[in-house]
Protein backbone atom coordinates (compact mmCIF):
# COMPACT_ATOMS: atom_id res chain seq x y z
CA UNK A 1 0.00 0.00 0.00
CA UNK A 2 1.47 3.33 -0.94
CA UNK A 3 4.50 1.51 -2.32
CA UNK A 4 4.77 -0.83 0.67
CA UNK A 5 4.33 -4.57 0.68
CA UNK A 6 2.19 -6.22 3.33
CA UNK A 7 1.81 -9.91 4.15
CA UNK A 8 -1.68 -11.34 4.53
CA UNK A 9 -2.23 -14.99 5.33
CA UNK A 10 1.29 -15.81 4.22
CA UNK A 11 0.97 -14.04 0.87
CA UNK A 12 2.65 -10.77 0.02
CA UNK A 13 0.26 -8.31 -1.51
CA UNK A 14 1.29 -5.00 -2.99
CA UNK A 15 -1.61 -2.55 -3.17
CA UNK A 16 -1.56 0.67 -5.16
CA UNK A 17 -4.01 2.49 -2.91
CA UNK A 18 -3.50 4.76 0.08
CA UNK A 19 -3.12 2.94 3.38
CA UNK A 20 -5.53 5.29 5.17
CA UNK A 21 -8.37 4.39 2.81
CA UNK A 22 -7.74 0.68 3.20
CA UNK A 23 -7.71 0.97 7.00
CA UNK A 24 -10.98 2.91 6.82
CA UNK A 25 -12.40 0.15 4.64
CA UNK A 26 -11.38 -2.44 7.21
CA UNK A 27 -13.16 -0.50 9.95
CA UNK A 28 -16.32 -0.16 7.88
CA UNK A 29 -16.63 -3.81 6.96
CA UNK A 30 -16.00 -4.87 10.56
CA UNK A 31 -19.68 -4.16 11.18
CA UNK A 32 -21.45 -7.23 9.83
CA UNK A 33 -24.74 -5.40 9.21
CA UNK A 34 -23.14 -2.36 7.66
CA UNK A 35 -24.03 -1.61 4.03
CA UNK A 36 -22.37 0.85 1.69
CA UNK A 37 -24.18 3.45 -0.38
CA UNK A 38 -23.02 5.42 -3.36
CA UNK A 39 -24.27 8.75 -2.03
CA UNK A 40 -21.66 8.87 0.76
CA UNK A 41 -18.40 10.43 -0.55
CA UNK A 42 -16.33 8.66 2.12
CA UNK A 43 -17.73 5.29 1.18
CA UNK A 44 -17.23 6.08 -2.49
CA UNK A 45 -13.54 6.30 -1.62
CA UNK A 46 -13.76 2.84 -0.09
CA UNK A 47 -15.22 1.41 -3.30
CA UNK A 48 -12.52 3.25 -5.24
CA UNK A 49 -9.88 1.76 -2.96
CA UNK A 50 -11.09 -1.83 -3.30
CA UNK A 51 -11.53 -1.47 -7.06
CA UNK A 52 -7.81 -0.76 -7.46
CA UNK A 53 -6.85 -4.07 -5.87
CA UNK A 54 -6.20 -6.80 -8.41
CA UNK A 55 -8.82 -9.55 -8.57
CA UNK A 56 -5.93 -11.94 -8.18
CA UNK A 57 -5.87 -11.00 -4.47
CA UNK A 58 -9.62 -11.35 -3.88
CA UNK A 59 -9.43 -14.92 -2.53
CA UNK A 60 -7.04 -13.70 0.17
CA UNK A 61 -9.09 -10.60 0.98
CA UNK A 62 -12.23 -12.71 1.30
CA UNK A 63 -10.61 -14.40 4.30
CA UNK A 64 -10.60 -11.13 6.28
CA UNK A 65 -14.30 -11.17 7.18
CA UNK A 66 -17.80 -11.86 5.90
CA UNK A 67 -18.08 -8.15 5.19
CA UNK A 68 -15.16 -8.30 2.81
CA UNK A 69 -16.59 -11.34 1.04
CA UNK A 70 -19.84 -9.43 0.59
CA UNK A 71 -18.06 -6.37 -0.81
CA UNK A 72 -15.96 -8.38 -3.24
CA UNK A 73 -19.07 -10.13 -4.60
CA UNK A 74 -21.10 -6.93 -4.95
CA UNK A 75 -22.03 -5.51 -8.38
CA UNK A 76 -21.09 -2.03 -7.10
CA UNK A 77 -17.45 -3.05 -6.94
CA UNK A 78 -17.46 -4.28 -10.53
CA UNK A 79 -19.20 -1.07 -11.63
CA UNK A 80 -16.51 0.98 -9.89
CA UNK A 81 -13.73 -1.03 -11.53
CA UNK A 82 -15.27 -0.38 -14.92
CA UNK A 83 -15.77 3.33 -14.18
CA UNK A 84 -12.15 3.96 -13.17
CA UNK A 85 -10.72 1.71 -15.88
CA UNK A 86 -9.38 -1.03 -13.60
CA UNK A 87 -10.84 -3.97 -15.52
CA UNK A 88 -8.73 -7.13 -15.73
CA UNK A 89 -8.64 -10.37 -17.65
CA UNK A 90 -7.63 -13.51 -15.80
CA UNK A 91 -7.12 -17.05 -16.98
CA UNK A 92 -8.99 -19.76 -15.09
CA UNK A 93 -7.84 -23.37 -15.16
CA UNK A 94 -9.02 -26.57 -13.50
CA UNK A 95 -6.28 -29.08 -12.65
CA UNK A 96 -6.68 -32.62 -11.46
CA UNK A 97 -4.15 -32.74 -8.63
CA UNK A 98 -4.51 -36.45 -8.26
CA UNK A 99 -2.28 -38.41 -5.97
CA UNK A 100 -2.40 -42.20 -5.80
CA UNK A 101 -5.08 -42.07 -8.54
CA UNK A 102 -7.50 -40.12 -6.33
CA UNK A 103 -9.61 -37.66 -8.33
CA UNK A 104 -8.86 -34.19 -6.92
CA UNK A 105 -9.91 -31.30 -9.20
CA UNK A 106 -9.08 -27.74 -8.16
CA UNK A 107 -9.78 -24.41 -9.85
CA UNK A 108 -7.09 -21.73 -10.07
CA UNK A 109 -6.68 -18.24 -11.48
CA UNK A 110 -3.50 -16.96 -13.06
CA UNK A 111 -2.42 -13.37 -12.56
CA UNK A 112 -1.68 -11.33 -15.71
CA UNK A 113 1.65 -10.44 -14.08
CA UNK A 114 4.41 -12.66 -15.46
CA UNK A 115 6.04 -15.25 -13.20
CA UNK A 116 3.12 -15.25 -10.75
CA UNK A 117 1.97 -18.57 -9.38
CA UNK A 118 -1.54 -19.92 -9.60
CA UNK A 119 -3.91 -18.84 -6.86
CA UNK A 120 -6.48 -21.33 -5.65
CA UNK A 121 -10.15 -20.47 -6.07
CA UNK A 122 -12.41 -21.07 -3.02
CA UNK A 123 -13.15 -24.76 -2.79
CA UNK A 124 -16.56 -26.06 -3.77
CA UNK A 125 -17.82 -29.58 -3.16
CA UNK A 126 -18.90 -30.20 -6.73
CA UNK A 127 -16.52 -27.85 -8.52
CA UNK A 128 -15.72 -30.31 -11.33
CA UNK A 129 -17.49 -33.68 -11.21
CA UNK A 130 -16.09 -36.47 -13.36
CA UNK A 131 -17.39 -36.43 -16.95
CA UNK A 132 -19.06 -33.04 -16.47
CA UNK A 133 -19.09 -30.45 -19.25
CA UNK A 134 -17.64 -26.97 -18.81
CA UNK A 135 -18.56 -23.94 -20.89
CA UNK A 136 -17.80 -20.25 -20.33
CA UNK A 137 -19.98 -17.25 -21.08
CA UNK A 138 -18.44 -13.90 -20.20
CA UNK A 139 -17.21 -14.09 -16.61
CA UNK A 140 -19.43 -17.08 -15.79
CA UNK A 141 -18.16 -20.67 -15.98
CA UNK A 142 -20.86 -23.38 -16.13
CA UNK A 143 -20.24 -26.93 -14.88
CA UNK A 144 -22.97 -29.19 -16.26
CA UNK A 145 -23.86 -32.70 -15.10
CA UNK A 146 -21.23 -35.40 -14.59
CA UNK A 147 -20.91 -38.10 -11.96
CA UNK A 148 -21.60 -37.19 -8.32
CA UNK A 149 -20.98 -40.00 -5.82
CA UNK A 150 -20.92 -42.44 -8.73
CA UNK A 151 -24.34 -41.39 -10.07
CA UNK A 152 -25.06 -39.23 -13.10
CA UNK A 153 -26.21 -35.78 -12.02
CA UNK A 154 -28.80 -33.19 -13.02
CA UNK A 155 -26.89 -30.41 -11.27
CA UNK A 156 -25.56 -27.27 -12.93
CA UNK A 157 -23.16 -24.99 -11.05
CA UNK A 158 -21.94 -21.55 -12.05
CA UNK A 159 -18.66 -19.96 -11.00
CA UNK A 160 -18.38 -16.17 -11.30
CA UNK A 161 -14.71 -15.61 -12.12
CA UNK A 162 -14.93 -11.93 -11.17
CA UNK A 163 -16.33 -12.28 -7.65
CA UNK A 164 -15.08 -15.87 -7.11
CA UNK A 165 -18.57 -16.89 -5.98
CA UNK A 166 -20.35 -20.18 -6.70
CA UNK A 167 -24.07 -20.56 -7.28
CA UNK A 168 -26.35 -23.37 -8.39
CA UNK A 169 -28.90 -23.25 -11.19
CA UNK A 170 -32.12 -25.20 -11.20
CA UNK A 171 -31.50 -28.88 -11.92
CA UNK A 172 -31.82 -30.18 -15.46
CA UNK A 173 -34.78 -32.35 -16.36
CA UNK A 174 -32.54 -35.41 -16.73
CA UNK A 175 -29.13 -36.48 -15.41
CA UNK A 176 -26.44 -36.14 -18.08
CA UNK A 177 -22.81 -37.23 -18.42
CA UNK A 178 -20.33 -35.82 -20.98
CA UNK A 179 -23.12 -33.87 -22.65
CA UNK A 180 -22.56 -31.32 -25.40
CA UNK A 181 -23.21 -27.81 -24.09
CA UNK A 182 -23.38 -24.57 -26.03
CA UNK A 183 -24.59 -21.06 -25.16
CA UNK A 184 -26.49 -19.26 -27.89
CA UNK A 185 -28.43 -16.02 -27.35
CA UNK A 186 -27.82 -16.33 -23.58
CA UNK A 187 -29.61 -19.68 -23.46
CA UNK A 188 -27.85 -22.89 -22.38
CA UNK A 189 -28.34 -25.78 -24.81
CA UNK A 190 -27.54 -29.27 -23.50
CA UNK A 191 -27.60 -32.25 -25.88
CA UNK A 192 -26.80 -35.90 -25.26
CA UNK A 193 -25.25 -37.46 -22.19
CA UNK A 194 -28.39 -39.52 -21.58
CA UNK A 195 -29.75 -42.57 -23.33
CA UNK A 196 -33.08 -41.23 -24.58
CA UNK A 197 -36.27 -43.18 -24.08
CA UNK A 198 -38.15 -40.79 -26.34
CA UNK A 199 -37.51 -37.74 -28.47
CA UNK A 200 -38.04 -35.32 -25.55
CA UNK A 201 -34.99 -36.76 -23.76
CA UNK A 202 -32.48 -35.86 -26.49
CA UNK A 203 -31.73 -32.42 -25.15
CA UNK A 204 -32.95 -29.45 -23.16
CA UNK A 205 -32.48 -25.70 -23.01
CA UNK A 206 -32.22 -23.35 -20.03
CA UNK A 207 -33.76 -19.88 -20.25
CA UNK A 208 -32.14 -17.52 -17.69
CA UNK A 209 -35.12 -15.18 -17.83
CA UNK A 210 -37.63 -17.80 -16.70
CA UNK A 211 -34.99 -19.93 -14.90
CA UNK A 212 -36.53 -23.09 -16.31
CA UNK A 213 -35.40 -26.06 -18.40
CA UNK A 214 -37.49 -27.05 -21.41
CA UNK A 215 -37.23 -30.07 -23.74
CA UNK A 216 -35.16 -29.47 -26.84
CA UNK A 217 -36.95 -31.08 -29.77
CA UNK A 218 -35.13 -31.57 -33.10
CA UNK A 219 -38.15 -30.12 -34.85
CA UNK A 220 -38.06 -26.88 -32.86
CA UNK A 221 -34.34 -26.04 -32.87
CA UNK A 222 -32.22 -24.66 -35.68
CA UNK A 223 -29.67 -26.74 -37.56
CA UNK A 224 -26.70 -25.06 -35.89
CA UNK A 225 -27.63 -26.43 -32.47
CA UNK A 226 -28.42 -29.87 -33.86
CA UNK A 227 -24.97 -30.03 -35.43
CA UNK A 228 -23.40 -29.86 -31.96
CA UNK A 229 -23.67 -33.64 -31.79
CA UNK A 230 -22.50 -34.40 -35.32
CA UNK A 231 -19.35 -36.54 -35.27
CA UNK A 232 -16.29 -34.69 -36.56
CA UNK A 233 -17.90 -31.29 -36.12
CA UNK A 234 -17.41 -28.36 -33.81
CA UNK A 235 -19.77 -25.59 -32.74
CA UNK A 236 -18.49 -22.32 -31.29
CA UNK A 237 -20.34 -19.05 -30.93
CA UNK A 238 -23.40 -20.48 -32.65
CA UNK A 239 -21.42 -21.53 -35.75
CA UNK A 240 -20.39 -25.01 -36.89
CA UNK A 241 -16.95 -26.00 -38.18
CA UNK A 242 -15.44 -29.29 -39.35
CA UNK A 243 -12.07 -30.74 -38.34
CA UNK A 244 -11.60 -32.34 -41.77
CA UNK A 245 -10.02 -35.50 -40.38
CA UNK A 246 -7.26 -33.74 -38.44
CA UNK A 247 -6.82 -35.37 -35.05
CA UNK A 248 -7.29 -32.57 -32.53
CA UNK A 249 -7.68 -32.39 -28.81
CA UNK A 250 -10.82 -30.75 -27.44
CA UNK A 251 -9.38 -27.20 -27.27
CA UNK A 252 -10.23 -24.63 -29.93
CA UNK A 253 -10.46 -20.86 -29.91
CA UNK A 254 -12.10 -18.51 -32.40
CA UNK A 255 -9.88 -15.49 -33.00
CA UNK A 256 -11.46 -12.80 -35.17
CA UNK A 257 -11.81 -14.56 -38.55
CA UNK A 258 -9.57 -17.48 -37.63
CA UNK A 259 -9.95 -20.76 -35.79
CA UNK A 260 -6.96 -22.01 -33.79
CA UNK A 261 -6.47 -25.35 -32.09
CA UNK A 262 -3.88 -27.72 -30.68
CA UNK A 263 -3.17 -30.59 -33.04
CA UNK A 264 -2.31 -34.05 -31.76
CA UNK A 265 -1.32 -34.94 -35.32
CA UNK A 266 1.36 -32.24 -35.68
CA UNK A 267 1.90 -31.49 -31.95
CA UNK A 268 1.69 -27.82 -32.86
CA UNK A 269 -0.57 -24.80 -32.74
CA UNK A 270 -2.59 -24.93 -35.97
CA UNK A 271 -5.01 -22.56 -37.65
CA UNK A 272 -7.53 -22.32 -40.46
CA UNK A 273 -9.83 -19.82 -42.08
CA UNK A 274 -13.40 -19.98 -40.83
CA UNK A 275 -14.70 -20.70 -44.33
CA UNK A 276 -12.04 -23.28 -45.22
CA UNK A 277 -11.28 -26.85 -44.15
CA UNK A 278 -7.47 -26.78 -44.44
CA UNK A 279 -5.46 -26.71 -41.21
CA UNK A 280 -1.99 -25.13 -41.25
CA UNK A 281 0.76 -24.89 -38.63
CA UNK A 282 1.37 -21.46 -37.06
CA UNK A 283 4.95 -20.53 -37.97
CA UNK A 284 7.61 -18.86 -35.85
CA UNK A 285 7.08 -20.93 -32.71
CA UNK A 286 10.10 -23.20 -33.06
CA UNK A 287 11.01 -22.57 -29.40
CA UNK A 288 8.07 -24.72 -28.40
CA UNK A 289 9.24 -28.30 -28.18
CA UNK A 290 7.28 -30.80 -30.24
CA UNK A 291 7.63 -33.19 -27.33
CA UNK A 292 5.55 -31.03 -25.02
CA UNK A 293 2.23 -32.34 -23.78
CA UNK A 294 -0.02 -29.45 -24.81
CA UNK A 295 -3.27 -29.39 -22.90
CA UNK A 296 -5.20 -26.20 -23.66
CA UNK A 297 -5.44 -23.13 -25.85
CA UNK A 298 -7.70 -20.20 -24.99
CA UNK A 299 -8.34 -16.56 -25.84
CA UNK A 300 -6.13 -14.21 -23.88
CA UNK A 301 -7.88 -10.92 -23.25
CA UNK A 302 -9.09 -10.10 -26.74
CA UNK A 303 -7.28 -9.24 -29.96
CA UNK A 304 -5.11 -11.73 -31.79
CA UNK A 305 -3.62 -13.33 -28.70
CA UNK A 306 -3.92 -16.83 -27.32
CA UNK A 307 -2.66 -18.53 -24.18
CA UNK A 308 -1.22 -22.03 -24.47
CA UNK A 309 -0.93 -24.38 -21.51
CA UNK A 310 1.15 -27.52 -21.33
CA UNK A 311 2.64 -29.84 -18.77
CA UNK A 312 5.89 -31.72 -18.43
CA UNK A 313 7.28 -34.27 -15.99
CA UNK A 314 10.63 -33.66 -14.30
CA UNK A 315 12.56 -36.35 -12.44
CA UNK A 316 14.90 -35.13 -9.70
CA UNK A 317 16.79 -36.31 -6.62
CA UNK A 318 15.81 -34.55 -3.37
CA UNK A 319 18.63 -33.09 -1.33
CA UNK A 320 19.87 -35.22 1.53
CA UNK A 321 18.47 -38.41 0.02
CA UNK A 322 20.35 -41.40 -1.35
CA UNK A 323 21.31 -41.35 -5.02
CA UNK A 324 18.79 -44.09 -5.71
CA UNK A 325 15.88 -42.00 -4.41
CA UNK A 326 14.04 -40.12 -7.13
CA UNK A 327 10.90 -38.04 -7.27
CA UNK A 328 8.80 -36.85 -10.14
CA UNK A 329 7.07 -33.49 -10.23
CA UNK A 330 4.63 -31.99 -12.69
CA UNK A 331 5.38 -28.58 -14.16
CA UNK A 332 2.50 -26.56 -15.61
CA UNK A 333 3.56 -23.93 -18.12
CA UNK A 334 1.73 -21.09 -19.84
CA UNK A 335 2.72 -18.75 -22.65
CA UNK A 336 0.89 -15.88 -24.32
CA UNK A 337 1.25 -15.76 -28.09
CA UNK A 338 0.29 -13.02 -30.56
CA UNK A 339 -0.46 -14.01 -34.15
CA UNK A 340 -0.31 -12.02 -37.38
CA UNK A 341 -0.67 -12.67 -41.10
CA UNK A 342 2.40 -12.58 -43.34
CA UNK A 343 1.55 -13.19 -46.91
CA UNK A 344 -1.13 -15.42 -48.35
CA UNK A 345 -1.84 -18.57 -46.39
CA UNK A 346 0.69 -17.85 -43.63
CA UNK A 347 0.11 -17.09 -39.98
CA UNK A 348 3.05 -16.29 -37.73
CA UNK A 349 3.14 -16.33 -33.98
CA UNK A 350 5.40 -14.55 -31.55
CA UNK A 351 5.65 -14.60 -27.79
CA UNK A 352 4.15 -11.48 -26.24
CA UNK A 353 7.03 -11.54 -23.77
CA UNK A 354 10.52 -13.00 -23.55
CA UNK A 355 10.54 -16.79 -23.86
CA UNK A 356 13.17 -17.20 -21.17
CA UNK A 357 12.16 -14.49 -18.71
CA UNK A 358 8.40 -14.49 -18.87
CA UNK A 359 7.33 -18.08 -19.15
CA UNK A 360 5.29 -18.92 -16.11
CA UNK A 361 6.64 -21.83 -14.11
CA UNK A 362 4.31 -23.34 -11.55
CA UNK A 363 5.23 -26.23 -9.29
CA UNK A 364 1.96 -27.87 -8.35
CA UNK A 365 2.37 -31.36 -7.03
CA UNK A 366 4.82 -34.14 -6.28
CA UNK A 367 4.13 -37.74 -7.21
CA UNK A 368 5.97 -40.34 -5.14
From Swiss-Prot:
Transmembrane segments: none
Keyword annotations: Kelch repeat, Repeat
Record-annotated F-box domain positions: 35-84
Top-level taxon of origin: Eukaryota
InterPro entries to which the protein is assigned, alphabetical: F-box/kelch-repeat_ARATH, F-box_dom, Kelch-typ_b-propeller, Kelch_1
Kelch repeats: 140-186, 187-233
PANTHER family registered for this protein in UniProt: F-BOX ASSOCIATED DOMAIN-CONTAINING PROTEIN, F-BOX/KELCH-REPEAT PROTEIN SKIP4
Name of the protein in question: Putative F-box/kelch-repeat protein At5g02995
Originating species: Arabidopsis thaliana
Amino acid sequence: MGGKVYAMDGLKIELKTNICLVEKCLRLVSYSNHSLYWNDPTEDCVWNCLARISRFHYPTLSLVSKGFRSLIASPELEATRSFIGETENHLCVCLNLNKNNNYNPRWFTLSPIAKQKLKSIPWHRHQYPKSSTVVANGSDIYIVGGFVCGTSSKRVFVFDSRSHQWRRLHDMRLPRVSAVVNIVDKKIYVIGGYKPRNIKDCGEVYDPNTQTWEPLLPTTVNLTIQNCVVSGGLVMGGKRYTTNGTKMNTCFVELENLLLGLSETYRDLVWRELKEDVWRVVRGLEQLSHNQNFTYVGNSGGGRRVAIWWKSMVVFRPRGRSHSTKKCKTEIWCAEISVERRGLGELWGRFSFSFRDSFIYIFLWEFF
